[in-house]
Amino acid sequence: MAVEYLKRGKPDAERAEDDAKTKVVVEATLKGIELRGDAAVRDLSAKFDNYTPASFKLSQAEIDDLIASLSDRELADIKFAQAQVRNFAQAQRDSMLDIEVETMPGVILGHKNIPVQSVGCYVPGGKFPMVASAHMSVATATVAGVPRIIACTPPFNGKPNAAVIAAMHLGGAHEIHVMGGIQAVGAMAIGTETIEPVHMLVGPGNAFVAEAKRQLFGRVGIDLFAGPTETMVIADDTVDGELCATDLLGQAEHGYNSPSVLLTNSRKLAEDTLREIDRLLKILPTADTASISWADYGEVILCDTYDEMLAVADDIASEHVQVMTDRDDWFLEKMTCYGALFLGARTNVSNGDKVIGTNHTLPTKKAGRYTGGLWVGKFLKTHSYQKITTDDAATLVGEYGSRLCMLEGFVGHAEQCNVRVRRYGGINVPYGTGAPYRDAKD
């Protein structure tokens, strides 16, 4: 495989060092929340957000006032985007069926899809108010039927952001708290004097929020590891450098540690894209962030063949993968490891982030190898059940169960089967033995 890097980002060792520092900070912060509750949350909010309201939880009157501050057009835009997310989530929900089957006479097996009973939705917004993240978590949880939805978002410029709060409320949040970072996800998962802990945390965030969710997993469920934004552009000479550069920088502006990768089989496109990035960084208002992100985490990878591009893409397993080639559907068919695909030059990651309807909370840091993104199914637990309705079935299944338990050395397990073989089948099975084999004529 001939793979050439025309530009590399930080070495993996340096990235791992950054992750290790984050882990230490998060661990200490979560311990403080567990020990000190609301007091720790208030101290952290004062330190990081310079925000100490009488109550972090918004009242209905405060929510109404914030929504009233938005224009009719702003509200219409929010409602349009939320409708697209709801429509797709509902279609996904409709595809998830409860089932019940009789696998043999008298044996009924089934499963039910039951909503998680309480969910904490984190909506990032300290640097940019992430209105769309409220649709992705809160509205999707509502479609799933979650009966208790808490939403948290940091203050923006020292106060609640009206658009984010409106999206949370319209999405169906039952409680809205203005707090961000580790303290928000920690309070929702651990609980405080004023916040009842949730069963599950969802939503994207910076490296500290993502690490906090990782450390809290087990105490609560999480949707997935959704850390700093990642984007990959897979392109050939059917598109130009301006388009590729725009798509790369459009995601690099998220934060200082947002990886952006161009994967191509065209040297000309690779070189043109590098020149276009230099040009665009001179006029991009968020260049102070995007330039650092591109310098430290940007990569341009040149391959000889489409098969090589596919192999490299699956190895990187990027969160967002923009495909602009003469064979977009081939990549859709062949790729196995990614967060979400954006197929064709008419499509772009920003549409997926904000309005098109698919969920933008997606796996990062190679998590796309083992999970997809947030969707309505993440809020549902599939629980199985079984029942035996006839004496014959209780006897037959019990006989096999008895012998298989004894094969593993579990006498107590076997007796659960044997007592039913005796009662419902009239067969004498001595205690501590497996059920006898029956001849075919029996």
Regions found by a protein language model. Name each.
Residues H254, L262-Y338:
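A glycine- and small/hydrophobic-rich beta-loop-beta segment
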Residues M1-Q117:
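N-terminal Rossmann-like NAD(P)+-binding subdomain of aldehyde/semialdehyde dehydrogenases
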Residues V3-R8, E175-G180, V300-T305:
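Short acidic-hydrophobic, aromatic-tinged amphipathic segments that line or gate anion-handling sites
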Residues G172-P259:
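Conserved NAD(P)+-binding/catalytic subdomain of aldehyde/semialdehyde dehydrogenases
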